[in-house]
Amino acid sequence: MAKKSPRESSAQAGKICVYIVAHADDWQLFMQPNVYFDMVSPRSKVILIITTAGDAGKADNYWMAREEGAKSSVRYCLAHQSPLTVSNGKRKFFNNSIEYWSCNQVTIYFLRLPDGNLDGTGFASSNFQSLYRLKRSQSSTVSAIDHSATYDWLKFISVIDSITGYESTGIVNRWIHYLNPDPLINPNDHSDHVMTGLAVQKITSINSFQQLVYTGYAVSSHPATLSSTDLFWKAGMFAVYEKAVHDLCGYSTLAENVDLYVKWCCTGPKIEMVPASSDV
């Protein structure tokens, strides 16, 4: 049987949920339980766009392991429901070749831009390229760390816009999720989180989506509010991510700061909602 294209699948989906994040573990840590509920909803189509490799200046096996960790989180959510149908490949958007991976109704796109570091200064391994420098015109372009594509700021926005439009064709009930770039609401967040959020807000179709805008690192200061069931799925999704990363490259994410990751895992999301425009 021929596999359905995204456009054919869209006709069967009653809702599209697009999650756009900078790093492979952002959606597990800061957007739960929303991602889980959307993934297991039978008529929801879930698209994850991960804008950077999250390489932190390390060797290639680290960012590759992070991608595998994200895939493990998806499989963990879906495997109890039905057999898994997995595919992968590349799609072109604005002549940029973008890697994708699909599992049932969930698709992840990996743009693999270089990690910009917490403050946007980047890392020596990628010649200090970053989305922060790109947005501030401190550099004219930034290249994916696998050399698959080169972007200026407008092209970065356009590629996100093109992926979102391609996947949402024919679906009226549209939701888009991203980390809040407003430092007054979401202070002291990673530069890649902020730049990705700013880009999402500039896509041409943004007003046709219901927007859910999340707090990132600062959510650790909020009280733990997850139910036992929601905590089970959130902690489990991060645990399988962490295991995949460690198994594949020997790096322990938890070793960075165990107490902080516990807070992130035990805390529910802090969300601002922006409704879709009635004029669209």
Question: What does each of the following model-derived ranges do?
Answer:
Residues 3-168, 201-202, 235-243, 254, ...:
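Active-site rim/loop-helix segments in enzyme catalytic domains that contact anionic ligands
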Residues 23, 190-193, 280:
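Histidine-centered active-site/metal-ligand motif
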Residues 56-60, 184-188, 222-225:
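A generic structural signal for short coil/turn motifs at secondary-structure boundaries
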Residues 111, 175-180, 213-215:
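Short, conserved beta-strand edge motifs with alternating hydrophobic and charged residues
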Residues 115-116, 182-184, 219-220:
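Short, catalytically relevant binding-site loops at active-site mouths
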Residues 156-202:
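Active-site adenylate/phosphate-handling loop in enzymes that bind or generate adenylated species
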Residues 189, 194-246:
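Extended hydrophobic/aromatic segments used for targeting, binding, or gating
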Residues 225-280:
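Terminal low-complexity/disordered tails
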